[in-house]
Amino acid sequence: MVKMRKRLAVACDACRSRRVKCDGQRPSCMGCLSRGLDCSYQRLPEPPATRLETELANVNMRLDYLAMLLSRQSQPQAPPPVLLASARPSSNPLSSHEDSPFRLLATDSIMSVLGLEDHFARRLVQLERASLLASTTTLSRMFFISHQQVTDALIAFSERVHTFYPILPLDFSERYFATLSGPLAPSCQTCLALLVAAIGCIARDPTMGDEYFEAALASLPTVLAECTLASIQCLVFLSIYYCCRLKPCQAHDYCLIASFKIQNLFKSELSVQLDVATSDTWKLDEYIPLPNCRYTWQFSCPPLPGNLAGVSPESASSSSSSISIDSTNSSTSTASDQAQSFFLAEIAMRRMLHRCNSAVAQSSDGRFCYAPSIALELERQLEEWYDYLPASIRFVREPAGGSFNGDQSALSPLSTFLNVQYCCCKLSIYWPAVYQVIQDDKATPQLLEHCQRFIDSYVQLLPRIALAIDKCLIYKWTLSVTFFVTTMAALKVANTAALRAAQHERLHESLALAGTVGWKNTEDSPSLELLRLNLSQHLREAKQK
């Protein structure tokens, strides 16, 4: 143990200024007493906390967090704390801005502007939480595993899910088939293989996959107890499973647990890598437990598209031997480059989505109003983001007033999702102009021009988001809520008298098309069912006017 050096004698201020030796006596040293001087000492700094004290403080913090979670479980009928916090006035100065009607988000203020009932947004959360308490399942691990079914599930998982979250190791195919051919003993590897099978079955048929998921839940205590890379992968895929099942609250809960485990894993890794000179931190050594982003799993499928009858676990695991090494490395490199390009573009897009509602200025009397110069700058940054997109994830940017190109249905799910975010960002940039007109009940030429840009953005968004809801399985619930909010906002524009001078022909055509968009496979989500019924009612009322 390293002993900290303690300084017992400290010179007083008078002796220090005169640069003479001080005996350190309290309250007055002998030198000051003999000379009749005021003797005062500087206050010693508090010693830093020891490692043991720091660890104990962290343990107490985690125990307090667990106690809070247990107290919530003991009161299942109480509304979530976030709802209680939003029900009363908050002292946080940001809360009023985040719930501002200038921000096109699913908040109470926006729902009120769009003509919906009070606390409509919170009712969606309450419906999802209530469905969680009602949907209790019994675990059943005894079921027959078809090799053909798990192979088809792995192919569907690779095509529709893994492109968004490429976090599996290179040898996952071998582990997957070996695990599902074994006794399914509770472990993180068993849970991971069963979750991939469950998600893949949902990707092929939304009515399948329950038996694999129920079997995976038998390993949940092990997953929660461990803090390994495999346990984090299981928690991420548990969140993805609930996203595919349109249960956002459960998905969010497991995502939070995974986030805490990732932070702990990084802390433990950094603590053993402090000896930088001898560590492999800068070498990206493959033996370090942290994940490596350079190589991820890719499922190489030799048969023709649509013909899965000839696929077997043996052919899937040995397909690399039938393909040349150069072509395999090329396809893996291309997929890896596409994934990395997507995540870089997604990070930049998320930052823009956080500030795309900021085209608002505060006047001298404290009133918020639309700031057109900020909106134009935000749109310039958005176009600059598009110009930097690589060809592997680039989508076709339609000009204002242009028609939708049906060939975009051949885009990858990654490009389709980015395309929707691009249009949503434009909508959010110019929504403050629309709300300014609604608030003032009049439109200046500049406001009218920017409201027209909002209309053009919605016209471009509608066919793309309808396509993305079917293609982007993981984000189906999020995209459905976005479709509802943006369509309700477009209805508000169409019914605003001050905006009649804008070109509404294509807007009315798009709203008529929105009424034909099917909410497929959303029956199990009470919140989406409520959104569907409300949107259908408002579209019918608008059509009758």
Swiss-Prot record:
The keyword Transcription regulation applies. It comes from Aspergillus rugulosus (Emericella rugulosa). Its main location: nucleus. The lineage of its organism: Eukaryota, Fungi, Dikarya, Ascomycota, Pezizomycotina. The keyword Hydrolase does not apply. One of its GO terms (cellular component) is nucleus. Signal peptide: none annotated. Pfam families: Zn_clus (PF00172). This is Putative transcription factor ecdB. It is found in: Nucleus. PANTHER family: ZN(2)-C6 FUNGAL-TYPE DOMAIN-CONTAINING PROTEIN, ZN(II)2CYS6 TRANSCRIPTION FACTOR (EUROFUNG)-RELATED-RELATED. Residues 12-39 bind DNA. GO terms for molecular function: DNA binding; DNA-binding transcription factor activity, RNA polymerase II-specific; zinc ion binding. It comes from the Eukaryota. Keywords: DNA-binding, Metal-binding, Nucleus, Transcription, Transcription regulation, Zinc. InterPro entries: EcdB-like_regulator, Zn2-C6_fun-type_DNA-bd_sf, Zn2Cys6_DnaBD. Residues 79-99 are annotated as: Disordered.
